[in-house]
Amino acid sequence: NSLISDKTALSAAPADTDEFLISDAGTLKRIDYSLIKATNTPMILAVSNTSQTVSDSTTTKVTSLNTQPINTGGTWDSSNHRWTPGVAGTYFLAGQTSININNAGSYLQAMVYKNGSVISYNQVTAEGTNATYISQACIIDTADTDDYYELYIRHNTGGNSTINYDTAYKYTNFFGYKLT
């Protein structure tokens, strides 16, 4: 006769204090769900929601990331446009930039900075003209409690360019979350 049936099945995620039985070399032990569940916080998604002009051949901080649809733990500094996780750990971080490029051979770069220095970089080169281009940079990085991260952009289109933004499609964005 089984103690487990469809009448005892969980219909939602377990509570942190729910317990599981495990076998440790043949000895049954209890463990709370809170000790084994995945937690990817702190986490951030910052999205560009306004126009920002970027000068030709100039590395520029993206300061138009004014919407944070996800911001759990950590600190988004809207005056400095940077994220401080606030919890030591290993993080996945990524940034995406988008502009229109009118000249074949021009490039667009996305860069993730840590504490004022670039740690991840990606470049796309335009193959055609009059098209929207997106560059994405990502990295797994170890942070302490006061490290901070920022998104930068650079292009060489021959003149000023405006960052593409749309809060629905999130053309230009920065995100990060704790892995361990």
For the regions a protein language model found, what residue spans apply to each?
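Generic detector of short, aliphatic-rich beta-strand segments that form the cores of beta-sheets
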Residues: N1, D32-Y33, F174-G176
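Short, surface-exposed terminal/edge motifs of secreted or surface/virion proteins that either
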Residues: I22-T39
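Extracellular/surface-exposed low-complexity repeats and stalk/linker segments enriched in Gly/Pro
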Residues: N1-A13
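Short, surface-exposed beta-edge/turn micro-motifs
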Residues: A15-E19, A88-T90
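Solvent-exposed alpha-helices and their adjacent loops that cap or buttress functional pockets
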Residues: A13-P14, T142
